[in-house]
């Protein structure tokens, strides 16, 4: 069992990583006997894990209610969020309740925002079931729902009480979802840790076949890197923005193509190549390093071009609504080398459009 602490003073919390955690009541700290829980999951995961997690919590003396949401990015909305509030109020649940997010990024983000908002804030626990949520979205306290005009535009910074990563969940993950998670894994290597990127080049095949030791190391390393950034810049005023490599472009793809048609990791993968091409055009990143990124993403089964039906011009309105925009000016996350990146303002729209065009499918 691995345990990593996200250090945020009185709001610090543990990330527990191991196989078989769903069999251990102690995994779900800080829950105690007699407490009340609303377990939030979706219709795909409920048949796989709901009874198991409910059972282990009830074994610990916890009183468990549940709400099952529809599955898909298109349901990460205010309307679906309201179903969680309704379930909480109907029971009813008070300020001493705990929400448990059992699912991937959609369930985690939506449940976290529900916890931040319900009765002005209740405790919640992240139980991520996808690779993407285990290495990224469950850690750091970003919670949100989407708006038709932009991804994650309505939300809050709100830290969980703990994160429970059961590696066994990856055994039920569809290959496309595994690849989507690998995009966020590769991102960490590009922005923060060149040695980890090298390791990924050598060990990607092991990750694709869900080799236990390789996957455990991969998730642990990501869960070490992200908390370091979050602890230094919890509310994304500077350093934390680096974690958004590829996201300004990627969120544009997701919004333009319709939420759920491109998985988040797929859009981020194409966006990271666009960021690399932008950096190339600025003369601060080599084409050889861009090719290393493209090769690794391709091996992972990820797209490296934008949608053929989306013109370069179609990206700009979405990018100008990005949360990193300051005083009407785009701020882009750009690689400087494998393992090093920067937040860059003042890049001309023409250069960005040309970089996007470099990445359009033939």
From Swiss-Prot:
Reaction catalysis annotation: 7-phospho-2-dehydro-3-deoxy-D-arabino-heptonate = 3-dehydroquinate + phosphate
Main localization category: cytoplasm
Gene Ontology CC annotations of this record: cytoplasm
Pfam assignment, any one: DHQS_C
InterPro entries membership: Dehydroquinate_synthase, DHQ_synth_AroB, DHQ_synth_fam, DHQS/DOIS_N, DHQS_C
Family matches, as CDD domains: DHQS (cd08195)
GO MF: 3-dehydroquinate synthase activity; metal ion binding; nucleotide binding
Family as reported in the entry's similarity comment: Belongs to the sugar phosphate cyclases superfamily. Dehydroquinate synthase family.
Identification of the protein by name: 3-dehydroquinate synthase
Gene name linked to the record: aroB
């Amino acid at each position: 069992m691995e345990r990593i602490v996200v250090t945020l003073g009185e709001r610090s919390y543990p990330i527990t990583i191991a196989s078989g955690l769903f069999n251990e009541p102690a995994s779900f700290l800080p829950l105690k006997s007699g407490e009340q829980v609303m377990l939030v999951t979706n219709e795909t995961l409920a048949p796989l894990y709901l009874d198991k997690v409910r059972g282990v919590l009830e074994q610990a003396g916890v009183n468990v209610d549940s709400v099952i949401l529809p599955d898909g990015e298109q349901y990460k909305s205010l309307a679906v969020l309201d179903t969680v509030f309704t379930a909480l109020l109907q029971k009813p649940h008070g300020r001493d309740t705990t929400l448990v997010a059992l699912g991937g990024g959609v369930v985690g983000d939506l449940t976290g925002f529900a916890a931040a908002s319900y009765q002005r804030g209740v405790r919640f626990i992240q139980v991520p079931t996808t690779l993407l949520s285990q290495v990224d979205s469950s850690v750091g306290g970003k919670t949100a729902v989407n708006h038709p005009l932009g991804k994650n535009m309505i939300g809050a910074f709100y830290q969980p009480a703990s994160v429970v990563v059961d590696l066994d969940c990856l055994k039920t993950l569809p290959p496309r979802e595994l690849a989507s998670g690998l995009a966020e894994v590769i991102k960490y290597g590009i922005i923060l840790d060149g040695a980890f990127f090298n390791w990924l080049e050598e060990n990607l095949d092991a990750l694709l076949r869900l080799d236990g030791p390789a996957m455990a190391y991969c998730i642990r390393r990501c869960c070490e890197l992200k908390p370091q950034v979050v602890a230094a810049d919890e509310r994304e005023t500077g350093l934390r923005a680096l974690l958004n490599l590829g996201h300004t472009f990627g969120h544009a793809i997701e919004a333009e193509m319709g939420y759920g048609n491109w998985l988040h990791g797929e859009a981020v993968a194409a966006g990271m190549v666009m960021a690399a091409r932008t950096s190339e055009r600025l003369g601060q990143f080599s084409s050889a390093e861009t090719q290393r990124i493209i090769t690794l993403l391709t091996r992972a089964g990820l797209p490296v071009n934008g949608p053929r039906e989306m013109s370069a011009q179609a990206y700009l309105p979405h990018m100008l609504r990005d949360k990193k925009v300051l005083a009407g000016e785009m701020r882009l996350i750009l690689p400087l080398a494998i393992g090093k990146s920067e937040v860059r303002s003042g890049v001309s729209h023409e250069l960005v459009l040309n970089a996007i065009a470099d990445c359009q499918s033939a």
